[in-house]
């Protein structure tokens, strides 16, 4: 393994371990909806969430899908998730988030956000910067965005992220799926998938807590 690839794997492993540790309590408290998660099957016929007919990258090797039931009004859940500039106020894994345009979030909107990557014995701590562009959005129903991520020693060519929101008995079922592509992300698919999955589980947990808290205010 080259030195560059070794450093990358170390970086991704550190991110995976950090996120997994932060979300370790999830499995003990997961509802049936929350339990339906894991690396998504690569089959084109295994239908995941879509927004206006578009889903994640069907050819991506790194992918993860999950869902959570949120006991809050649909509008509150959708608003919490799509008010991207407020992410740092309720997402433990988001340091900063800024819109690169103005007005309501819509197809064509872009935003830049950052998440920490912890230090390892061989690499210093860094910050992963993600620039996302919304391609599809349907109010109170779904949103899909894509974009690259860059940090010291780590790069994801493109992440594709889809969210759907459906009213069901007991609240709103939030489903999400994300894929990563690029040589670096694919250098160690299991570890990259672990990092992606741990991050999405924490995101869902934080979204549930934030939306339910705001609904009771």
Question: Which residues does each PLM region occupy?
Answer:
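Hydrophobic ligand-binding cavity/cleft-lining segments
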Residues: 2-5, 30-101
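Glycine-rich portal/gate segments that line the openings of hydrophobic small-molecule binding cavities
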Residues: 99-153, 205, 210-217
């Amino acid at each position: 393994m080259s030195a560059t690839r070794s450093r990358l794997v170390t970086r991704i492993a550190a991110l995976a371990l950090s996120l997994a540790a932060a979300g370790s309590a999830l499995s003990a408290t997961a509802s049936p909806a929350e339990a339906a998660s894991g690396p998504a099957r690569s089959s084109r016929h295994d239908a995941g969430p879509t927004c206006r007919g578009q889903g994640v990258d069907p050819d991506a090797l790194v992918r993860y899908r999950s869902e959570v039931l949120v006991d809050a009004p649909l509008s509150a859940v959708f608003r919490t998730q799509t008010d991207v500039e407020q992410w740092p106020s309720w997402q433990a894994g988001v340091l900063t988030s800024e819109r690169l345009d103005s007005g309501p979030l819509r197809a064509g909107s872009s935003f830049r956000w950052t998440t920490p990557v912890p230090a390892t014995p061989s690499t210093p701590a860094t910050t992963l910067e993600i620039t996302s562009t919304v391609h599809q959005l349907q109010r109170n129903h779904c949103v899909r965005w894509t974009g690259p991520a860059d940090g010291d020693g780590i790069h994801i060519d493109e992440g594709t992220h889809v969210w759907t929101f459906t009213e069901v008995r007991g609240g709103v079922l939030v489903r999400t799926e994300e894929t990563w592509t690029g040589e670096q992300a694919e250098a160690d698919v299991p570890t990259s998938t672990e990092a992606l999955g741990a991050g999405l589980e924490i995101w869902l947990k934080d979204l549930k807590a934030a939306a339910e808290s705001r609904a009771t205010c």
